[in-house]
Amino acid sequence: MNMDNFFNLVAEDLQLGKVLKNPVQVTGGFMHRMFKAVTEQGSYIIKLLNHNIMKRPTAMGNYKIADDIETILKQNNIPAVYALEFKNRKMQELNGQYYYVFEWYDGKSLKDGEIKSVHCEKIGEVLAKIHNIDLKNEPFEKDEMHIDWQKYIELAKDMNSPIYDYIKDYADLFNDSMTKVNEAIKKLLPVKAICHNDMDSKNVLWIGDEFKLIDLECLRYSNPYLELFELALCWSGYEGCNINFNLFNTFFKSYFYNTNLDANVDWEALYYSNN
């Protein structure tokens, strides 16, 4: 596909005006490709959806769910880069290529060493506001984990895999962890809320102390406690194996200051449920 021709057709089809510069690919998309396009009407991000993902039978339905929930977030003034609507829909299609169009937002995501208390305070607050939109006293169904580790040990041995010794030596640990996960899932409180489901630091763009959320395609109803615990860990350095407990506590305090959810829950069960 000739990309310049494609973007010219997009601009014409959506009446964005003439393309003034050749669109350039920007970083940030793991599964999809992102391009910045400058037209007579402004600067945009055009997100080209991965063909292989769109072939999945559940893809269109999942995007429809996310698009509908995205509209709810916008109605509740959650700061985010929202997909633009054309022809009464957000997802567009041209010559078999599905895509979204967003207004360009000149912010940047933060790396672990750049995250400060003010960032955790703001993200804890906005997470609470998202969860508060539509809290439901309903159980969130999370699948239990059932993995036959012995089967994989035998496969690794047959293939002379370098991971054979590792998984053989730690099989008891894997099975013990799996048991704890399944026990923890049964202890989850019966509550559901709108969740971003991918709101780690790479999906929040900052300009100074102001921010906007991006990548809203994972929006779903989920257990808010699970998302809270996961994000508090992510924003305090867990993924880099260097937790800053001041950031962790700031995130939690900000969240519970802005919600009526009970903080007195089984946090160990939540930890194992996230594994």
Question: Each predicted region: which residue ranges?
Answer:
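All-alpha amphipathic helical-bundle segments outside canonical DNA-binding/catalytic cores
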Residues: 261-273
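Juxta-kinase regulatory segment immediately upstream of eukaryotic protein kinase catalytic domains
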Residues: 1-21
